[in-house]
Amino acid sequence: MPTLTKAELAEMLFEQVGLNKRESKDMVEAFFDVIREALEQGDSVKLSGFGNFQLRDKPQRPGRNPKTGEIIPITARRVVTFHASQKLKALVEERVEPMPASAA
């Protein structure tokens, strides 16, 4: 399955919007910088029709070293989660091609 990169997003802006390549790259970088800065400040980011980036605090918990079996603490941390909007989920579900039946 192919992956869309920031460079490819900039190229698409160049082709579809008519910005020059430098402006396209700068716009993509600025977009992600704004999202990154909002999350760093503890804000959620809601993109209508796309989804929400939210912060979630995970408490400290016990973990286990798989080699020694020793119990070690996993420190508390903050993680970023993404929840796709219903609209995005519906669009993705529409495009799913059924798996071919196995020849058994």
Curated annotation (Swiss-Prot):
Domain of life: Bacteria
Annotated stretches, region: Disordered: 51-70
GO cellular component term, pick one: cytosol
SUPFAM superfamilies: IHF-like DNA-binding proteins
The keyword Transcription is annotated on this UniProt entry: yes
GO biological process per UniProt: DNA recombination; positive regulation of metabolic process; regulation of DNA-templated transcription; regulation of translation
GO MF: DNA binding; structural constituent of chromatin
Pfam families the UniProt entry points to: Bac_DNA_binding (PF00216)
InterPro entries linked to this entry: Hist_DNA-bd (IPR000119), Histone-like_DNA-bd_CS (IPR020816), IHF-like_DNA-bd_dom_sf (IPR010992), IHF_alpha (IPR005684)
UniProt keyword terms in alphabetical order: DNA recombination, DNA-binding, Transcription, Transcription regulation, Translation regulation
Family, as annotated: Belongs to the bacterial histone-like protein family.
Oligomeric form and interacting partners: Heterodimer of an alpha and a beta chain.
NCBIfam families xrefs: himA, PRK00285.1
HAMAP family in UniProt: IHF_alpha
Function: This protein is one of the two subunits of integration host factor, a specific DNA-binding protein that functions in genetic recombination as well as in transcriptional and translational control.
Identification of the protein by name: Integration host factor subunit alpha
Organism encoding this protein: Ralstonia nicotianae (strain ATCC BAA-1114 / GMI1000) (Ralstonia solanacearum)
